[in-house]
């Protein structure tokens, strides 16, 4: 268990984390709601994913670019995504989840209250904004909201994600918790 340093913020991310399964909520109900097949759910529950996150402000537009690279174990290929925090939806296809419309933005806890208060709860004191990602799977009628931020659990600062999955009249909520691995290193050319 490694705490995320206090100087690491969402505005200047360039760091890596590893999922802490002991502190995460059970992801099974979320994956069921998202239509993930049983075998894939079981496999996902056995691996510990690392994630590298980076935020880069664009001085020309004033918008922030958000990069996430997901690194599974055992030498499996990593996957990544880039989002502009402008809340403009773009269509992507993800093998496990199908075709999705994804939009990402900075959001205040008050803005998140309008969707579900869970999305903005629990983050460290003084949090003014978090990263909010919304994904829509129109084929399954599933809308997933997740927020990226930091919170203290038993006095230790972690990167966390609060997730709300809505399908029909049902909502599933969970928090994913990540241990700090360290800063990303520049790739050598």
Swiss-Prot record:
Disulfide bond annotation, renumbered to this chain: none
The entry's keywords: Isomerase, Virulence
Keyword hit for Isomerase: yes
Xref: InterPro entries: Pericyclase_pydY-like
EC number annotated for this UniProt entry: 5.-.-.-
Keyword Oxidoreductase: no
Pathway note: Mycotoxin biosynthesis
GO molecular function: isomerase activity
Enzyme class: isomerase
Record-linked PANTHER family: LIPOCALIN-LIKE DOMAIN-CONTAINING PROTEIN (PTHR38115:SF1)
Sequence similarity: Belongs to the pericyclase pydY family.
Described function: Probable pericyclase; part of the gene scp cluster that mediates the biosynthesis of a hirsutellone-like compound that has still to be identified.
Protein name: Probable pericyclase scpY
The organism of origin for this protein: Mollisia scopiformis
């Amino acid at each position: 268990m490694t705490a995320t340093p206090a100087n690491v913020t969402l505005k200047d991310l360039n760091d890596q984390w590893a999922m802490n399964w002991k502190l995460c909520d059970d992801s099974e109900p979320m994956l069921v709601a998202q239509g993930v097949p049983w075998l894939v759910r079981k496999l996902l529950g056995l691996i510990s994913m690392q994630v590298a996150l980076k935020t880069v402000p664009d001085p020309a537009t004033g918008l922030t670019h958000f990069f996430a690279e997901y690194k599974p174990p055992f030498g499996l290929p990593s996957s990544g995504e880039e989002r502009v925090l402008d809340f403009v939806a773009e269509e992507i296809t993800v093998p496990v989840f199908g075709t999705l419309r994804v939009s990402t933005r900075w959001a205040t806890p008050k803005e998140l209250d309008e969707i579900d208060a869970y999305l903005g709860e629990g983050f460290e004191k003084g949090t003014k904004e978090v990263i909010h990602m919304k994904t829509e799977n129109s084929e399954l009628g599933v809308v997933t909201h997740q927020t990226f931020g930091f919170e203290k659990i038993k006095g230790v600062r972690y990167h966390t994600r609060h997730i709300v999955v809505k399908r029909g009249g049902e909502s599933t909520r969970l928090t994913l918790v990540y241990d700090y691995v360290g800063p990303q290193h520049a790739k050598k050319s």
